[in-house]
UniProtKB/Swiss-Prot annotation:
Species of provenance: Drosophila mojavensis
Keyword set includes Methyltransferase: no
SS bonds (residue pairs): none
Protein name (Swiss-Prot/TrEMBL): Male-specific protein scotti
Keywords noted in UniProt: Developmental protein, Differentiation, Spermatogenesis
InterPro entries: Soti
A Pfam family of this chain: SOTI
UniProt record similarity statement: Belongs to the male-specific scotti family.
Length: 152
């Protein structure tokens, strides 16, 4: 038995292009080639036939006119280099002024004294420091002590 290639060809029924369906129109858009330029308008059947006959033309006709917009580039902020900052003299640079909380000398000294103590014993040591040092010898006539609760 011999393997023979079938002599039958597959024919797709394509609509015939008729001269009646093709319309030639002068391309007179005022750019100077109105006399020589011609446009050819094809109906849907003729366009389909042309696409089937020539796949390269079909790819060109189906291709988008512009490259696709990639949105993931627009979602990220664009890194713009910063302008070089003006060099300023250290004498003219203002620094924030930190206001010291208003405390009497006894409280400030007591707080400084308990900083080296373990955190769980600080409250007890602070109270002992206040009792030991709040006397008339350190603060004669109550000078430097708060006049009322919550003043310092």
């Amino acid at each position: 038995m011999e393997n023979r290639v079938a002599d039958e060809l597959i024919h797709l029924p394509l609509p015939e292009v008729q001269a009646v369906n093709v319309i030639n129109v002068r391309h007179g858009d005022g750019d100077g080639d109105g006399e020589n330029g011609w446009e050819r308008h094809l109906d849907d059947e003729q366009m389909q036939a042309m696409r089937l006959e020539n796949p390269q033309v079909a790819m060109l006709l189906d291709a988008p006119h512009e490259p696709p917009i990639e949105l993931h580039h627009m979602l990220e902020p664009v890194n713009v280099p910063e302008r070089p900052r003006k060099k300023r003299s250290f004498l003219t640079i203002s620094k924030p002024f930190h206001v010291q909380p208003e405390r009497c000398a006894l409280i400030s000294n007591g707080w400084r004294a308990v900083q080296c103590v373990q955190p769980e014993k600080r409250g007890e040591c602070f109270a002992n420091y206040l009792i030991k040092h709040m006397n008339s010898r350190n603060y004669p006539n109550g000078e430097g002590l708060p006049k009322r609760w919550g003043q310092y």
